[in-house]
Amino acid sequence: MLDTESRWAIAESFFKTRGLVRQHLDSFNDFLRNKLQQVIYEQGEIVTEVPGLKIKLGKIRYEKPSIRETDKGPMREITPMEARLRNLTYSSPIFLSMIPVENNIEGEPIEIYIGDLPIMLKSVADPTSNLPIDKLIEIGEDPKDPGGYFIVNGSEKVIIAQEDLATNRVLVDYGKSGSNITHVAKVTSSAAGYRVQVMIERLKDSTIQISFATVPGRIPFAIIMRALGFVTDRDIVYAVSLDPQIQNELLPSLEQASSITSAEEALDFIGNRVAIGQKRENRIQKAEQVIDKYFLPHLGTSPEDRKKKGYYLASAVNKILELYLGRREPDDKDHYANKRVRLAGDLFTSLFRVAFKAFVKDLVYQLEKSKVRGRRLSLTALVRADIITERIRHALATGNWVGGRTGVSQLLDRTNWLSMLSHLRRVVSSLARGQPNFEARDLHGTQWGRMCPFETPEGPNSGLVKNLALLAQVSVGINESVVERVAYELGVVSVEDVIRRISEQNEDVEKYMSWSKVYLNGRLLGYYEDGKELAKKIRESRRQGKLSDEVNVAYIATDYLNEVHINCDAGRVRRPLIIVNNGTPLVDTEDIKKLKNGEITFDDLVKQGKIEFIDAEEEENAYVALNPQDLTPDHTHLEIWPSAILGIIASIIPYPEHNQSPRNTYQSAMAKQSLGLYASNYQIRTDTRAHLLHYPQMPLVQTRMLGVIGYNDRPAGANAILAIMSYTGYNMEDSIIMNKSSIERGMYRSTFFRLYSTEEVKYPGGQEDKIVTPEAGVKGYKGKDYYRLLEDNGVVSPEVEVKGGDVLIGKVSPPRFLQEFKELSPEQAKRDTSIVTRHGENGIVDLVLITETLEGNKLVKVRVRDLRIPEIGDKFATRHGQKGVVGILIDQVDMPYTAKGIVPDIILNPHALPSRMTIGQIMEAIGGKYAALSGKPVDATPFLETPKLQEMQKEILKLGHLPDSTEVVYDGRTGQKLKSRILFGIVYYQKLHHMVADKMHARARGPVQILTRQPTEGRAREGGLRFGEMERDCLIGFGTAMLIKDRLLDNSDKAVVYICDQCGYVGWYDRSKNRYVCPVHGDKSVLHPVTVSYAFKLLIQELMSMVISPRLILGEKVNLGGASNE
């Protein structure tokens, strides 16, 4: 029998052979190997307007990532680190062979450079994917870096997996209540870059109507079938179903189209919708075009594919009628069998297709232009390689993809090791987060083992942003023609053959009605006598390796339905399971021994047919046991590792099954904010902002997954001695008390790095920036003191202390506008654009990097580091969602101590536990204590319970402590023994990146906004604290009139305006006469100064612009002393 260790060996082998970001790498590798060439083949050849000239397209290939320093220089290979440091794009040049054909005479094939393709790190095109560890260290890479991201303009970009409803599948549902549509079937047909939705609706009058893009209105079902070549009613009826009851339901639809009897008439009917008022031939031609190109394009776009489309449409209509007759349930849109995840390869294919089309369009234009001028054909000179390069780079840099999707690529989150891995495994749903799609946000049963049940954000994205579970993989997809061939070889009879046998050979309809329908990727292939048997045969040939392991098959049998669904498309989330035969798993102890010795790997077990990947649809046929002891002869599969239902982050939580579920969700969010060692090459990286914990520790209470994820090598936290007690009252409301002496010994110290960089840009017209120390005459000169740290080259030197406002890189630029330039002397014309340390930040210059960009401009990067020692207000959290800020630091002498002299590092208030039910934390405290006393880490993997709590308590008793983990404690200030025993244990605490030093902010005077003249907002702009409407209401309630005036007028935007005493308008200042003048009465009236809020003056003037005439009526000013004067 497989014990825990054996199953763990299988799971461990999975992570070793597949890594943690396999899904992106597989997808991108498939793009490089197959899809890239496929896009070229789709284009086939470039046809021009020039008579007799076309260009055939051949093979495409890519080289190793490289750059060309200057326009004419040689190509040179680069490393990812060089790309990061010099703000380059890590991309490979791509070459396409082209054959010019002039007057049917083929020329010599020429290979032409057509652009650069950004390369995913660790993919097949990346040379670092097979370098040994020492070589990786030599080129400045973190040897454990998993790859799966791109480097664009020096920054790391991840492509986020996009979850979508499966395309090319018919989904049926009830119509909206109250409308005249009773049932709906939708299919989004997607092929070669465009998606077309086809809607099939059953109306209250029992007719069936079809609507799709480019054809206005609805088309009756029978008419579109005739247009597709099903001329007689009998053809149409048998295409839909062999069942007389369903055939009867088609009568109203057939009657609706009774006047149209031929394919030509049907095409003319459609032509009248798309080409109104044209000649009949034109109408028919246009209708044929529309049907071929925009109706179900995934089945093909040539006239030969019309029959195929007819059968597809008929099977969709059959589905609607089955729903109407109560023979099937509506499709569940949230079932994971109906979802597909689009990964980097998919998204890159659609992006490259659009870029390549733009490239072809430009090439055609250039060819025609050069032919008009009568030049010799020289392809090399006409190809503009930057079209593809820029299109792809721009999409990756901004995240704006083709098809109007935003946020597809994001900056890789490098807060710590976990946050990076989690970002690479994230899955985003395409639903709008503004709507309350409750069902879509819920955890669905089919997500078991595919999506992490805990890791999802709080707030508007909850349930829409998910993360892959540990063992989940995403299918890459194989060509369906292979599977189709196998199905026909196994004896599947095509729909056409069945109809032919019934109509021509007069075979019995009843016979075929009992047969199973066979679907391949949602398309009806045909009929088979025994569906269960067929599914079994397909599974067997998959397990024997005759069929690709990408293929999944499900047999669906209900009272009415009898269907086999075969899937082999891309984007299905699948999970591996051990195959069980007669109650015994096929993986035996012999296999485990070989696994542990490294003789075989996980992939070998898949090849041997002992483990298989199951998608959500096939899992409907599986009966999976959670543990070997649960197996019965009925079981078909066994889970490899029960806690693999969790994602990467949730699997670091010890004892998560003892916590209330939302607590695990909170921890999943906070683990991404904890500080640790985010990359082992941090010293040479130039991240915009980075945090580094000085002394990260491995948790004493481990879960098995920590090792395979790599958390033990890149931890983010430290083990703290925790006492759960109320002490001094400074740990109320989730704050914690920390031992000041522990902090002085270096506990939870961290460093914050911030990068400042600038480049000498060259402007059109020969002007350029200069990195130098600015001279006193320059516009915007800051004063000598600010430039004191600069060296002769205008850059600060390393290990210099800097404070907010100090210049790190001196730089002068030409003026923004030309008219300035003409008036001023050349020296005055320059403006100071130096890079200064951020306001309120200080630190030490850590690294200065001077290099060149690809254009040959000088690039300077300066990294400043700042030591962060924990202080009051810094945020900490355990691994159970228990977050709190430091309430006070107490010296060790004043902290409580146990009889053995142990002093806690952290004191947590007991009120943090009962209502939150984080029992996992109490168990961790006990486990940590046992680990520290016994000297071996404790395994707290979920669903295992090894070692059991009771056993640990017995051991703790043997080691001389109370089994309930409590201690007799003495008050540190008085030395008195406390009445209660206090729970002492060791808990892993994480320091989060919310620190007081980054948030503390106050201001007296400072900058104001130009428009309203009110103080700016926010810490970065030295803004004020807003005294809002509710605060104002409080002061009104208190009756403090002077205070209201002080806050809302004197200290905000007090302004004096001059008002005409006759008309009440705001006057203007006449410089020549040196006085204020009324815009209506000119000099004839007197203007009086009035103190108002500047925002009020602005409001008046904005109202005037809308032709509303506000006037201020002046009265006597009343002094508080009682005497009145003007």
From Swiss-Prot:
Its cofactor is Zn(2+). Its EC number is 2.7.7.6. Binds 1 Zn(2+) per subunit. Its main location: cytoplasm. Pfam families: RNA_pol_Rpb2_1, RNA_pol_Rpb2_2, RNA_pol_Rpb2_3, RNA_pol_Rpb2_4, RNA_pol_Rpb2_5, RNA_pol_Rpb2_6, RNA_pol_Rpb2_7. One of its GO terms (cellular component) is DNA-directed RNA polymerase complex. It catalyses: RNA(n) + a ribonucleoside 5'-triphosphate = RNA(n+1) + diphosphate. Keywords: Cytoplasm, DNA-binding, DNA-directed RNA polymerase, Metal-binding, Nucleotidyltransferase, Transcription, Transferase, Zinc. It is found in: Cytoplasm. One of its GO terms (biological process) is DNA-templated transcription. The keyword Transcription applies. InterPro entries: DNA-dir_RNA_pol_su2, DNA-dir_RNAP_su2_dom, DNA-dir_RNAP_su2_hyb_sf, RNA_pol_bsu_CS, RNA_pol_bsu_protrusion, RNA_pol_Rpb2_2, RNA_pol_Rpb2_2_sf, RNA_pol_Rpb2_3. One of its GO terms (molecular function) is zinc ion binding. Zn(2+) binds at C1060, C1063, C1078, H1081. Part of the 13-subunit RNA polymerase complex. Interacts with TFS4. Belongs to the RNA polymerase beta chain family. DNA-dependent RNA polymerase (RNAP) catalyzes the transcription of DNA into RNA using the four ribonucleoside triphosphates as substrates. This subunit is involved in DNA promoter recognition. This is DNA-directed RNA polymerase subunit Rpo2.
